[in-house]
C-alpha cells in the first residue's frame, strides 16, 4: 500500500477496514485474524487495539482484562509480555486456534508488512492510569522502528491521548472516536478541532446527514463501525462515509467494492 490518505479518491469506493482483523472467522486481534485480512482482496485497512504490558511493551488486546479472549485472568497491565505469551488466545473462539497468542504491535507490523494500512486504537485504563504519553510514546517508537509512519492512523475514545500523540508527532493522522455518554450533542467538527484530528469515527447509530455534512464541511473523513451486513453497509455508503469497519469484511467486500459503488 502507498502512504495512507484519510479519504478515498473522489468517486472511489469507501475504505473497507477489518475490525480487529477478520474477527468473524478468527479470534479477534490475533495474527490469524490479521493474516486473513491481508489475504482478502479489497480490504484496505486493519483496525486493532493496543495497551501496555507490565514491562511497558505494546500488546494488541481490546479489553482491560484477559479472560474474555484468552486463558489469562485479571488486568493485562499486571502481566509481562512473556507471561502473556503463556496464555491461549484462540480456543475461546474455536479449538483450532489454540496456538494463537496475544501479539505485540511489533509482531503485527512485521506480519502485515505494509500490505494494508493500520488503524491503531489507543486504549486507556481508568484503573491503571498511564503516565502521560507512555503508551503513545511506545507506540510511536515501534511504528518508527518498523518504518510504518506513513501507513497508519491513530484513534481513541480518550481524546487527550490523541492530543498527546499530536504533540509527540505533529504529522500523525488521528481519529476521534465518538462516545455517546460523553459527546452526545457535539458535532464532529468541534470534537476534531480540539485535538487536531483528521478523522471522525462513530457507531452506525450515530450517523445522520447532519453529522456527515458537518464533518464534510470541516474537511474530516467519516469512518463508521461496526457494519457486518450488506444492508448496513449500503446505508452508510449512501450517506457518503469514507470508511467502513466490519468484523466480516471478507463477507461484505463483494458489495462494498463492487463496480459502481
What does each model-found stretch correspond to?
Residues 1-261:
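Phosphate-group recognition and catalysis centered on beta-loop-alpha active-site segments
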Amino acid at each position: 500500500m502507498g502512504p495512507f490518505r484519510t479519504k478515498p479518491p473522489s468517486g472511489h469506493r469507501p475504505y473497507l477496514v477489518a475490525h480487529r482483523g477478520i474477527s468473524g472467522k478468527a479470534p479477534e486481534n490475533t495474527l490469524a485474524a490479521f493474516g486473513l485480512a491481508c489475504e482478502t482482496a479489497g480490504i484496505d485497512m486493519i483496525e486493532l487495539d493496543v495497551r501496555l504490558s507490565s514491562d511497558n511493551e505494546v500488546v494488541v488486546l481490546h479489553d482491560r482484562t484477559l479472560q474474555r479472549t484468552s486463558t489469562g485472568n485479571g488486568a493485562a497491565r499486571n502481566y509481562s509480555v512473556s507471561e502473556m505469551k503463556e496464555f491461549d488466545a484462540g480456543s475461546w473462539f474455536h479449538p483450532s486456534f489454540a496456538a494463537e497468542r496475544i501479539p505485540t504491535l511489533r509482531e503485527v507490523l512485521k506480519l502485515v508488512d505494509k500490505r494494508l494500512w493500520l488503524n491503531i486504537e489507543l486504549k486507556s485504563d481508568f484503573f491503571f492510569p498511564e503516565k502521560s504519553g507512555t503508551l503513545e510514546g511506545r507506540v510511536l517508537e515501534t511504528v518508527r522502528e518498523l518504518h510504518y509512519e506513513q501507513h497508519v492512523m491513530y484513534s481513541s475514545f480518550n481524546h487527550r491521548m490523541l492530543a498527546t500523540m499530536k504533540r509527540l508527532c505533529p504529522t500523525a493522522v488521528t481519529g476521534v472516536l465518538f462516545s455517546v455518554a460523553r459527546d452526545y450533542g457535539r458535532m464532529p467538527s468541534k470534537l476534531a478541532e480540539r485535538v487536531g484530528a483528521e478523522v471522525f469515527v462513530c457507531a452506525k447509530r450515530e450517523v445522520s446527514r447532519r453529522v456527515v455534512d458537518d464533518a464534510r464541511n470541516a474537511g474530516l473523513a467519516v469512518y463508521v463501525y461496526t457494519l457486518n451486513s450488506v444492508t448496513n453497509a449500503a446505508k452508510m455508503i449512501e450517506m457518503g462515509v469514507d470508511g467502513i469497519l466490519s468484523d466480516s469484511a471478507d463477507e461484505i467486500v463483494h458489495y462494498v467494492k463492487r463496480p459502481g459503488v
